[in-house]
Amino acid sequence: MTAETLTPDDRVLPLSQALLLPRIAIESTMPVIDGGEFAVKAVVGQRISVTSKVFADGHDTLAVVIRWRALQDESWHRVVMADVGNNGWEGAFTVTAQGPHEYCIEAWIDTFASFCYELRKKHEAGVPVSLELQEGRSLVLQAAERSDNPLRERLMLLHHELSGLLETEQVALFLHDDSAHLMTQADHHAYLSISTVYPIDVERERAQFASWYELFPRSITDDPARHGTFNDVHARLPMIHDMGFDVLYFPPIHPIGRKIGRAHV
């Protein structure tokens, strides 16, 4: 059955299947070649800029990171991506070793950031926020309960401090960067989605660009009665290097035999 012949009923998934679908979509990730079929090329020391379209249903705040590693490494590096508008996210990482690498995009609902966004909007509009403050204290307590020390102790201290403040002071503390940092460490990554893992082939720097110098070894001689040798070429290497060349290129070198030489038919 083609898309053109689908009826509206065919496009509606059963509730049991719909509930299993991810809330977060990760699309149009770059750099990617043929959906990850082939590896992106890079060189050691290159900064790789990554862009992606990430969105979800509703108005919750998203957290998006790049996960990357050298293929032989067990652990992943993480780089926070920035929201650039219109569901666009961007970030970058630098590869420092030669060999195969891989990366993917990881996204989740940032529960505390979503709470802070709503709290700020309502507080600035003069809307009563007593219920929101109660919800926020509950979020901090839940974060403490799922964390280990010393993070647990710091979150419990934050919860205790919030409980003794006036409403305006609680708002200020909830919106403080230190509170966001603590809650980020304890985030349970709600509705986590992970993209396809994409390969990167990291080459040595000269694989991207190099200056090539070509010469004929037999012509490198200071004696008209003697053809040049590789030893004569060795003596020329400092001069070639000083001219700014990186690679020495030889044309095809054919051995000359006494009986079946290249010039004999």
Spans of model-derived segments:
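Extended acidic/polar, glycine-enriched regions
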Residues: 82-133, 139-190
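N-terminal carbohydrate-binding accessory modules
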Residues: 186-208
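Aromatic-rich carbohydrate-binding modules that target alpha-glucans
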Residues: 57-96, 118
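Aromatic-lined carbohydrate-binding/catalytic grooves of carbohydrate-active enzymes
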Residues: 206-230, 240-264
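Beta-sheet entry/capping signal
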Residues: 63-65, 92, 100-102, 246-251
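Non-catalytic, glycine-rich low-complexity segments
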Residues: 2-57, 116-147
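Short, polar loop/linker segments at the starts of domains and inter-domain junctions
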Residues: 39-44, 48, 219-234
